[in-house]
Curated annotation (Swiss-Prot):
It is found in: Cell membrane. The active site is at S174 (nucleophile). The gene is pyrD. FMN binds at A61, G62, L63, D64, K65, T85, N138, N171, K216, T244, G267, G296, Y317, S318. HAMAP family: DHO_dh_type2 (MF_00225). It is a peripheral membrane protein. Pathway: Pyrimidine metabolism; UMP biosynthesis via de novo pathway; orotate from (S)-dihydroorotate (quinone route): step 1/1. Substrate binds at K65, N110, R111, M112, G113, F114, N171, N176, N245, T246. This is Dihydroorotate dehydrogenase (quinone). It catalyses: (S)-dihydroorotate + a quinone = orotate + a quinol.
């Protein structure tokens, strides 16, 4: 069923298709028809970052940047939904075209550039939430904010979303905001995370509620860089790490004209690279910090591979675009089967 709908949607411009699909999902949820599309996912609860997830398969950030559709997306069977990336001020993102599909490679390239309506819009949407599941909010910096002042943007977003999120993700790994990935390296990472950790404590004391903070990292790092990042995450008391974002590499799409487009590559071609990062990261962390695995999950086996490498939870994005809601159940079943076989 979904494959027929997908084939029709894929005839549209990718960004138009994206917006149309979300509008249709939103309408279905309002008309109480969303259950017809939902995956049948058995409850397989897992506790991570002090939160109880009904199943380990979540939706990665980027699909619902503004919090306009998470009620509908959350009704499809996901164990958790992450919205954003959001920035302090609204921004248009990069010029179009900026989203490209490569169906033959089950891949997507995007250079969206954190296009969003701003954190105040997202908070207003979340205040009206009907979705009762785990909601993550992914925060970033505005393109016009100098990298040396990035912490101010992250603090602004942290303060505004804290009371409305179940967990918060610090996105320092998108390749589409100039200079952003530099925050992952050297003293820059500590200088960013230390003030966020301090503010987390202030907000916890003020509101009486602890909201965990995860950091989303890139796949384009060698083992020594991964080890350095892991050390800082532990040193600064982060609660989790999401591995990984899109890659600037082009392995797997070299033969396609669209593969030459600038931006972050996601989907099947990033699967092995992200799994390798998870494995290396897990060795460095020694089980002291939970990992959420994302990148190239298209079935139960690839979801289980992420868990085998060290992930406690997984997220899907490109696989969800290509495979539809059935992927949620398949991924959850693959992970459950892996755990049963241990």
């Amino acid at each position: 069923m979904y494959s027929h709908v997908r084939d029709l949607l894929f005839r549209l411009n990718p960004e138009t298709s994206h917006e149309f699909s979300l509008d249709m999902l939103g309408a279905a949820e309002r008309l109480k028809l969303i259950g017809l599309m939902a995956a049948k996912v058995p409850e397989t609860p897992v506790e991570v970052m002090g939160l109880r997830f009904p199943n380990p398969v979540g939706l990665a950030a980027g699909l619902d940047k503004n919090g306009d559709y998470f009620n509908a997306l959350g009704a499809l069977g996901f164990g958790f939904v992450e919205i954003g990336t959001i920035t302090p001020r609204p921004q248009p993102g990069n010029a179009q075209p900026r989203l490209f599909r490569i169906p033959e490679a089950k891949a997507i390239i995007n250079r969206m550039g954190f296009n969003n309506k701003g954190v105040d819009h997202l908070v207003a949407q979340v205040k009206k939430r009907r979705y009762q599941g785990i909601l993550g909010i992914n925060i970033g910096k505005n393109a016009t904010t100098p990298v040396e002042n990035a912490v101010d943007d992250y603090l602004t977003c942290l303060r505004k979303v804290y009371d409305h999120a179940d967990y918060i993700t610090v996105n320092i790994s998108s390749p589409n905001t100039p200079g952003l990935r530099s925050l992952q390296f050297g003293d820059s990472l500590s200088q960013l995370l230390a003030p966020l950790k301090k503010e987390q404590g202030v907000l916890q004391q003020a509101g009486g509620r602890y909201v965990p903070i995860a950091v989303k990292i890139a796949p384009d790092m060698d083992d020594s860089e991964i080890a350095q990042v892991a050390g800082v995450l532990l040193q600064e008391g982060m609660d989790g790490v999401i591995a990984t974002n899109t890659t600037i590499g082009r392995e797997g799409v070299e033969g396609y004209d669209t593969g030459k487009e600038a931006g972050g590559l996601s989907g099947l071609p990033v699967r092995d690279k992200s799994t390798a990062v998870i494995q290396s990261l897990n060795q460095c962390l020694g089980g002291k910090l939970p990992i959420i695995g994302v990148g190239g999950i298209f079935d139960g086996a690839s979801a289980a591979d992420k868990v085998r490498a060290g992930a406690s939870l997984v997220q899907v994005y490109s696989g969800f675009i290509y495979e539809g809601p059935a992927l949620i159940a398949a991924a959850a079943a693959g992970i459950a089967s892996y755990h049963q076989g241990q």
